[in-house]
Amino acid sequence: MTTLLSAERVTFAYPQDGRGLQPTSLQLDEGQALFIGGESGCGKSTLARCLTGMIPHLYHGKMSGRVWLAGQCTDQTPLWKLSDLAGLVFQNPAAQMLSPTVEEEIIFGLENLGLSPTEIRRRVDDTLARFDLERLSLRSPQTLSGGEQQKLALAAITARNPALLILDEPLSMLDTSAAFDLVALLSRRTTEGGAVVICEHRQEYLKDFPNLQTIVLDGAHSELANESGVDWLTQESTEIRLEAENLSVERGGHTILNDWSFHLLGGQVTAIVGRNGVGKTTLLRVLAGLQPYSGELAVHANNRLERPQLGIVFQNPDLQLFNPSVREEILYHIDQPDIARYNSLLAILDLKRYEQVPPLLLSEGEKRRVALATVLMRCPQHGVLLDEPALGLDAFHKYLLLRLLEALAAAGQVVVFSTHDIELAAQANRLLLLGPQGIVASGPPQQLLMQDSIWEHLGLRIPDWVRPLC
């Protein structure tokens, strides 16, 4: 059996803060798969970069140890040669989108292999069909949802057919059906002789994966969060009811939302669930006042009608982080900051040790926690909206997130998050289920999760490990 990947006591430290990867060794042969786990910020993404040769070729820092791809030492082999052997899908797929259309994104990698136009066309058509991207082939990648971008990044890499796939959180932005489909596709690749490395927090999706090895990276262990600090975040409770009537959004000639009507209550944590591309992000942007729409949107509070004043945490935190340190990011343009509130946010979100670190150097999960802290530091009047807040979070930090959202709701605020993590959604007070034609159902998770017909209508699978939670 041929060894495709091996690493011998590989370490790496970034120059800005010295964080990175502790000594790690591994070996992967043809037909095998490797799961890499560990808490947020332990170095999974750094290891993925080391295994593909992006470290040391593209990232500065101190590396020791050696990595071999198909017998070639990565620090002595040009990156363009290594890219023929291994493909990497980033944790943030938007960071690897280069082309003006979905189809051209796939074509770009194939042209760099020097394939004939006939072979390129065959692979493009096959890949678009396999990843259910045919209807999006002429769309700009930048207009896709996060899940659709993740599918496109996977499609573009697999179309090149490298012997080794290295995937950084490949399931994080996918709906449950798409996640199971991807696991099946990766499983077939290993049975056909390929190899796969999967860095993930959602290991439960891989429980039946054939020939799967597992390593768990050590990292800087999280400090015990000071949950009593949640009290600082609460405000005087008022009755808040957000009413939406006949909301519609059109963008680029496409109807995204069509005559949607619903309400949201303060005092509840509401989870929005639906397939990739159904309109979850667009809906949150409308509620935050960032997306033009037609229809009526108002908040009933303090016995009067008000315009919604809601903070929002984007699915891609890079879009709202730009300061040189976490401290400066959270306190940005606040004239007289409430330092007690600031310190509580650091404790609750486990960010104290990163206070002087540039936010964009953090892991994806850590960046999301910083983005949430920046929003909550500004005390949004009516509540907070979070787009896929659990991406990149381990179980401990998901617990902290839920504890915080529950405290905000207990203060009477509107708290809404979108998610593909059904296990997380099951712990909300209310589910809002979205389909292509609008809102399919709304109610307590314990009721909706037991109604198979609704989920079949949505085209979503309920993972078997979620049912016991109900």
Model segments located where?
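ABC-family nucleotide-binding domains
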Residues: 175, 387, 394
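Catalytic Walker B motif of ABC-type/P-loop ATPase nucleotide-binding domains
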Residues: 165-169, 384-388
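Conserved beta-strand-loop-alpha-helix hinge in the C-terminal portion
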Residues: 205-208, 215-237, 438-463
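Conserved ABC ATPase "signature" region
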Residues: 118-136, 339-354, 373-376
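ABC ATPase NBD Q-loop/coupling interface
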Residues: 66-81, 290, 296-312
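The feature captures the beta-strand-to-loop junction immediately N-terminal to the Walker
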Residues: 37-39, 273-275
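ABC ATPase C-loop
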Residues: 158, 376-378
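Conserved ABC ATPase signature
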Residues: 140-144, 148, 358-362, 366
